[in-house]
């Protein structure tokens, strides 16, 4: 949430927001009320979030008048998607979830007698920061004021200045770089920043008895931030880290793998194989890294860990499943809350494309819904008005990914992490299974599968 920001809702809408996440689809009368200029109402929402070792109190005050001229026609929502490039394996599933949300939202609007529709305009960024900015500028030229995405922190960092300067509201489903946690800007993120994932990774690895880790990581906003967060948290536990940074555009990782292989060999002689590991902080190129690691005996004999860039990554199992299964590649990713909404979306995406969605399919679905509710709440298509009311809506919304409470920087206020591993199926193929769960409140790992 944003410091000092006042959020506008009518008294009828304020009451509705307390339950809107649970009753979407059964609130037809709400929109009729929202189309009539209401009296100004001030509401205050205070949420106390306990996240060991810190307890955070988040307060949002709403004092803006909603209403005015009734919205009509198509309301455009931009979507900066990784339909190709280094995160294409994620983009396909997220695009599917977004289309499901768009259809459901428009059915909701139709049933409630509204004169406007919610239109998603998808643009492929190819996971390239420069192209993401070009696509945002193109959307802005077409009058788009609200944008979903992009997927990567590198892209978000590159578009942030333009979005802030031009008052375009951007809500990312998956950007996690801690450096982008900035209060009172025009950027929200429906995931926690990587200070949380760094803590989860350090606990996961240290609890396995590992004291020395080679980190092979992508040299961009996301990779740099996550490597730093992990190294800081792991260092607190007495662990040693050797970071090896690579160019995000690289296709040959022999230099990095050779360095890692030598360091692992040195450590194994000094401390034993059980005390060393590799942490891979990569996107889809993790498949290439794993394939090329076949040439390095020390790396193949070592347990690997991954992150949200590899967890449930379809390219990893299709291109390098045998290597990933051998080294395990235990990968952390923000955990959705299991609920009927979660299960419904999971089955819908699976039926549409034959793949289970990952967490960011759930968060992008929730972004679409919360933006639709925000538009209806304010009664205007205006980024600043939506920005003001958005934290209160998220604080009272329970979606497919769970409760969407935000912190002072406009990012999700923490949560647990699922830990995924690659296994060989009875059919001889490879798949991801949830192997463990990291609980943030207790700072503990619970295993669901044999290690």
Regions found by a protein language model. Give the residues of each.
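Extracytosolic ligand-binding ectodomains
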Residues: 1-451
């Amino acid at each position: 949430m944003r410091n000092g920001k006042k959020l506008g809702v009518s008294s009828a809408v304020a009451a509705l927001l307390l339950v809107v996440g649970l009753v979407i689809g059964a609130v037809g009368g709400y929109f009729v009320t929202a189309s009539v200029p209401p009296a100004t109402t001030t509401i205050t929402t205070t949420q106390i979030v306990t996240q060991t070792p810190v307890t955070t109190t988040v307060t949002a005050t709403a004092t803006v008048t909603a209403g005015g001229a009734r919205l009509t026609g198509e309301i455009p929502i931009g979507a900066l998607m990784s339909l190709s490039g280094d995160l294409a394996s994620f983009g396909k599933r997220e695009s599917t979830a977004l289309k499901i949300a768009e259809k459901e939202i428009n059915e909701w609007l139709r049933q409630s007698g509204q004169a406007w529709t919610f239109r998603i305009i998808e643009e492929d960024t190819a996971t390239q920061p420069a192209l993401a900015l070009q696509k945002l500028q193109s959307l802005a030229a077409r009058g788009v004021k609200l944008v979903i995405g992009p997927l990567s922190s590198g892209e978000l960092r590159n578009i942030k200045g333009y979005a802030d300067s031009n008052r375009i509201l951007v809500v990312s489903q998956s950007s996690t770089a801690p450096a982008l946690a900035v209060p009172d800007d025009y950027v929200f993120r429906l995931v926690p920043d990587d200070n949380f994932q760094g803590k989860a990774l350090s606990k996961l690895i240290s609890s396995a008895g590992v004291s020395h880790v080679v980190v092979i990581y992508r040299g961009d906003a996301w990779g740099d931030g996550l490597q730093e967060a992990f190294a800081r948290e792991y260092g607190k536990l007495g662990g040693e880290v050797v970071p090896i940074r690579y160019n995000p555009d690289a296709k040959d990782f022999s230099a990095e793998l050779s360095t890692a292989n030598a360091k692992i060999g040195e450590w194994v002689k000094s401390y034993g194989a059980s005390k060393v590991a590799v942490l891979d902080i990569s996107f889809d190129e993790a498949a290439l890294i794993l394939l090329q690691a076949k040439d390095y005996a020390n790396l193949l004999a070592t347990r690997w860990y991954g992150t949200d860039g590899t967890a449930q990554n379809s390219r990893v199992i299709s291109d390098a499943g045998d290597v990933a299964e051998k080294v395990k590649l235990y990968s952390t990713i923000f955990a959705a809350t299991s609920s009927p909404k979660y299960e419904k979306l999971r089955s819908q995406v699976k039926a549409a494309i034959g793949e289970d969605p990952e967490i960011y399919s759930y968060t992008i679905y929730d972004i679409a819904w919360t933006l639709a509710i925000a538009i209806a709440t304010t009664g205007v298509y205006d980024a600043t008005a939506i920005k003001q009311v958005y934290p209160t809506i998220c604080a009272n919304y329970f979606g497919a990914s769970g409760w969407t409470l935000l912190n002072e920087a406009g990012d999700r206020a923490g949560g647990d992490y699922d830990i995924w591993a690659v296994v060989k199926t009875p059919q001889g193929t490879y798949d991801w299974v949830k192997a463990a769960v990291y609980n943030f409140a207790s700072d503990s790992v619970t295993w669901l599968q044999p290690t």
